[in-house]
């Protein structure tokens, strides 16, 4: 029950905007929408719906394109939080009602999560553990001279060399990633965020 209690959905401006839009969706169609999003939730690079399907959803739910995207993103966010906290269906329903989602919609979330939650969590585990493993990290600095004769500034680039292996192979594949100063700083900040989230879960 500790994991369930840890799930807290923030009442952010986008969440407050999305809740009435979700509440207005036809209750009969809502479970199918949830089911489709849950099926593809673990495929981060892939959208749950094609452009043509999104147009049909806009018409069916009487939503503008931007409103539909907000609804889909919010539903995905809620379900991702349920995955990361491995929350119980009843706790998910309770949290959704606390952010003013109508009871029928909160129940639909809980019902979909009860039916597909564990399967979705397992898909996420497989994606996270994945077939690739980081074996080595190397780095070097490259200095590139500016092409302009007037500007003799050097543009330093950091090159990370990542050695990754697959579980079923002995060879280590080398992946080179190049960063300028800003890109490296942004990457560092992302690592800090990831580290903070890991620390909060351990």
From Swiss-Prot:
The keyword Membrane does not apply. Coiled coil: none annotated. PROSITE patterns: COMM. Its main location: cytoplasm. InterPro entries: COMM, COMMD10. Residues 133-202 form the COMM domain. Pfam families: COMM_domain, COMM_HN. GO terms for cellular component: cytoplasm; nucleoplasm. It is found in: Cytoplasm; Nucleus. Keywords: Acetylation, Cytoplasm, Nucleus, Phosphoprotein, Transcription, Transcription regulation, Ubl conjugation pathway. The modification N-acetylalanine is found at residue 2. The modification Phosphoserine is found at residue 155. Component of the commander complex consisting of the CCC subcomplex and the retriever subcomplex. Component of the CCC (COMMD/CCDC22/CCDC93) subcomplex consisting of COMMD1, COMMD2, COMMD3, COMMD4, COMMD5, COMMD6, COMMD7, COMMD8, COMMD9, COMMD10, CCDC22 and CCDC93; within the complex forms a heterodimer with COMMD5. Interacts with RELA, RELB, NFKB1/p105, NFKB2/p100. Interacts with CCDC22, CCDC93, SCNN1B, CUL1, CUL2, CUL3, CUL4A, CUL4B, CUL7. Scaffold protein in the commander complex that is essential for endosomal recycling of transmembrane cargos; the commander complex is composed of the CCC subcomplex and the retriever subcomplex. May modulate activity of cullin-RING E3 ubiquitin ligase (CRL) complexes. May down-regulate activation of NF-kappa-B. Belongs to the COMM domain-containing protein 10 family. This is COMM domain-containing protein 10. It comes from Mus musculus (Mouse). The lineage of its organism: Eukaryota, Metazoa, Chordata, Craniata, Vertebrata.
């Amino acid at each position: 029950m500790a994991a369930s209690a840890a799930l807290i959905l923030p009442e952010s401006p986008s969440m407050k905007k999305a809740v009435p839009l979700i509440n207005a969706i036809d209750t009969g169609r809502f479970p199918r929408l949830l089911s489709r999003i849950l099926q593809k939730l673990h495929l981060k690079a892939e959208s749950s719906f094609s452009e043509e399907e999104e147009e049909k959803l806009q018409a069916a739910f009487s939503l503008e394109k931007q409103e539909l995207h907000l609804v889909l993103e919010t539903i995905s966010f809620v379900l991702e939080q349920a995955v990361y906290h491995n929350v119980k269906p009843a706790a998910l329903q309770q949290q959704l009602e606390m952010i003013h989602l109508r009871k029928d919609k909160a129940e639909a979330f809980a019902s979909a999560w009860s039916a597909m939650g564990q399967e979705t969590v397992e898909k996420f585990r497989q994606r996270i553990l994945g077939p690739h493993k980081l074996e080595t990290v190397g780095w070097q600095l490259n200095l590139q001279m500016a092409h302009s004769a007037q500007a003799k500034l050097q543009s330093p680039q950091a090159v990370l060399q990542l050695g990754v292996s697959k579980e079923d192979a002995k060879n280590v594949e080398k992946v080179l990633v190049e960063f300028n100063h800003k890109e490296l700083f942004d990457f560092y900040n992302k690592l800090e965020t990831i580290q903070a989230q890991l620390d909060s879960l351990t």
